Amino acid sequence: MPDRSREIVVLAHCHLNVNTKVHGLASYPGARTDALLPLIEAGAGIVQLPCPEATYLGMKRWGMTVEQYDTPAYRRHCREILAPVIDTLAALAADGCVIRNVLGVDGSPSCGVAETCSGYCGGEIEQIVDGDAPAQRAVRKPGRGVFMEELEEALRSAGIEDLRLIGFNEAG
């Protein structure tokens, strides 16, 4: 029986399943093989995070910004869906595994690590569709997404601190 690597990498959900992204945002057909194959070949164990946006709003959601997700209800939702993941990671760490990295998605309002998505203006959707409202532009800005902030705090509370959060830049 081969020895275990005891190395764990935590992945944002869409790295393994692009189908949870907002429609129109997929830049690969299913799983992000360019990022995942090297991890698998190196023998890393993979823990997939749940997709907070999909579990909160479903598949037929609009793209949103960090300002729209930064609410007490969404943060509570993030903490609730993270609880079993944190329990698993704590159990793995207690069993001698090393949680090396969390791979997020830069530019995401939820899973951004170095950059998130900002730019909420508000208004009625009919005005935006009909062109009667000012154009609303989302921009990338430095900072963590809401889910990554909650994950980082939950990891710290569980005593899992010696790991890196890495933002995978899907914009190229």
Name each model feature, range by range.
Residues 1-4, 31-45, 84-100:
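Short amphipathic alpha-helices and their capping/turn segments at secondary-structure boundaries
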Residues 2, 6-7, 18-30, 114, ...:
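Residues lining hydrophobic/aromatic ligand-binding pockets adjacent to catalytic sites
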Residues 4, 59-67, 71-94, 123-172:
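Divalent-metal-activated hydrolytic enzyme cores
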Residues 8, 100-103:
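Structural motif
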Residues 14, 102-109, 170:
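Short, well-ordered beta-to-alpha junction loops that form the rim of enzyme active sites
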Residues 18-19, 56-58, 108-114, 118:
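Short catalytic/ligand-binding loop motif for oxyanion handling, primarily in non-cytosolic enzymes
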Residues 27-29, 119-122:
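Glycine-rich, phosphate-binding/catalytic loops in enzymes
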Residues 27-69:
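Short, surface-exposed acidic-centric catalytic microdomains
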